[in-house]
Amino acid sequence: MSTYEEEHGIQQNSRDYQEVGGTSQEEQRRQVRSQLQGLFQNFGNTSGEGDAHSDSTLLLRLLSQMLPESLQEEWLQEMDKGKSAGCPDTFAASLPRINKKKLKATDNCSICYTNYLEDEYPLVVELPHCHHKFDLECLSVWLSRSTTCPLCRDNVMGHRIINEIDTTEAELEEDWGMYG
């Protein structure tokens, strides 16, 4: 009796049968598959914390073996970017303040929902690009973790850079007016 490969004229792919550390790649794949199958079967049936920890460790080890190193490095870099995702501390302090007289009785902070006028001395700031108003304390906490407006999710740092460039160009034009 002939094999499937012989009947269909398929030649054996040499890379499937390369010996790597004494076992072929196909054997390694079978081992990984059986480990993953056992892991997923037992994953929800753990009785103690130690079992769950060992299962998750095994899962991470298997995934690290299966994923290319370049992809692992890319994911680690993306995770590191997320840690320092907030605005500089000076950004919130530099935002323009809103005068108490310009606030309406119905104006509330969109983060904490506190009425601005309940406070005797409200510290209300406005984001320059979208003109959304927030309590300074609430916005400072938000901007320490994110670079977006809490309401519209627009990037506040990108607009700040554009505004700085525009004011610099305007100042340069004014200076040239003195000499012309």
From Swiss-Prot:
Q: Which domain of life is it from?
A: Eukaryota
Question: Which biological process annotations from GO are given for this protein?
Answer: protein ubiquitination
Q: Does the keyword Lyase apply?
A: no
Pfam families from the entry?
Answer: zf-RING_2
Listed SUPFAM superfamilies = RING/U-box (SSF57850)
N-acetylserine-modified residues are where?
2
Zinc-finger ranges (RING-type): 109-153
Q: Which PROSITE patterns match?
A: ZF_RING_2
- Which Gene3D superfamilies has this protein been placed in? Zinc/RING finger domain, C3HC4 (zinc finger)
**Keyword set for this entry?**
Acetylation, Metal-binding, Zinc, Zinc-finger
Where does the signal sequence lie? none
Q: Which GO terms describe its molecular function?
A: ubiquitin protein ligase activity; zinc ion binding
The keyword Acetylation is assigned to this record: yes
Which InterPro entries is this protein grouped with?
A: RING-H2_zinc_finger, Znf_RING, Znf_RING/FYVE/PHD
Q: Name one GO cellular component term.
A: cytoplasm
Q: Where is this region: Disordered?
A: 1-31
Miscellaneous = Present with 195 molecules/cell in log phase SD medium.
Report the protein name in the record.
Answer: Uncharacterized RING finger protein YBR062C
